[in-house]
Amino acid sequence: TSTVLLQVLRLGLMALAVGWAYLFVDAWRLGQPLTLQRQHRLAVVGVNGFLCFSVAGALLFGAHVIGVQRDFMLSMFGDGKAVGAHHGRYNVLLMGGDAGAGRWGLRPDSMTVASIDAETGKTLLISLPRNMQNFPFPEGSVMGEQFPDGFDEEGMYLNGLATWALDHAELFKGSKHPGVDATIEGVEGITGLEMNYWAMVNLEGFKDLVDAVGGVELNVRQRIPVGLPHDSFFRYIEPGTRTLDGMDTLWFARARHDSDDYSRMARQKCVMSAMLQQVSPQVALRNFEKIAGASSAMVSTNVPRGEVDRFVDLALKAKSQKIATLSLVPPMVNTANPDIDEVHAKVAAAIAKAEGRALEKTAEATAEATAEAAEGESAETAAQTAESPAPEQGAAPTPAAPVTPSAPPAVTGGSVGSLSTGYAANQSEDLGAVC
């Protein structure tokens, strides 16, 4: 990922290609082809030409690919300072917003914290609703000084922080992205987590990325509208397991017609999970140039170039593990007046569970309870056996109760669950299983 090393390697391959071509031309000259018979001369020229252009062409193509990677690294990532893991985890705020006129980076439609174990890559996705209100900011932060009692402005929500910050950019001295900085401070106040990095995804450009990898396979549980009823292209994605192109994947992730914000958040998580699981290194290598072009136009981030290798390694580790999710949405959280202490406790518990710490405690408690219950059941069974009369010989056995088939899970807006009971993909220990 070193741009200097990539440039040196690129120039080296180009020089090697020129040198290789010169070597074959010189070998052809030393062979004195004009002294050979016509057929032999044509054969020698053909073999030399094939070897010259094939080898030199391969080297030049390699130089081109390296040049694409270098340009991608320069345009996508900065040269900022690396930030170490907080309590063994990297917390990255992922934001999605429209690229329409006057909207890029202003009002993110979706906000998700990817909390990643620095050793194992085990990932917890913490989603925040855009309509969250009445939340605090970290002590000493810019927004904390402006709103010491929390963000309680009438009609202002979490996704409005960026707009407020851009209107008061003078408060964020030296910041290139005041809207992002304000949003990060809000997310840190809500979750109690300190962010390492952030990434802003242009949702319109997301279509090109999906097309670059050949589409994504998703389980469509209900008809999902593409566009709005008044759009000329309005149609539906029909139910079933389908490979969707960029346009359909984008609408699968963001459609709200006949749905709600929280069902949409659940579908967005399913898209994230599918992309992580289905985009293999082989697919990425095969479509590298397309992916690089789409990604550099789609994502703005403060992840430094020196950290890219680390996050690629963590992503490869995450592919083989279950992704856990936590969404700070109803019915678990009152978005209009959240209990922040309770939210912090739920975030801490979800991280502990993802790391296995909660499971270890639960296993110990379960083992103790099972042992105590087994002792009690043994004594009770012995007493019942002594008191119960033996069954008469030849008596018919008592028929077992019929098994009642379980009802299929409710599906609302294309997601398992409902607004009143919550959506499975929003609170899950295995995101892939509920999608």
What are these regions (language model features)?
Residues 15-25, 53-60, 309, 322:
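Alpha-helical transmembrane segments
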Residues 23, 27-37, 61-72:
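Perimembrane helix-loop junctions in membrane proteins
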Residues 37-68:
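Internal/C-terminal transmembrane anchor helices
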Residues 2-32:
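Membrane-embedded alpha-helical segments of integral membrane proteins
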Residues 4-11, 39-43, 288:
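Structural motif marking the loop-to-transmembrane transition
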Residues 60-435:
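Non-catalytic, solvent-exposed segments at the cell envelope interface
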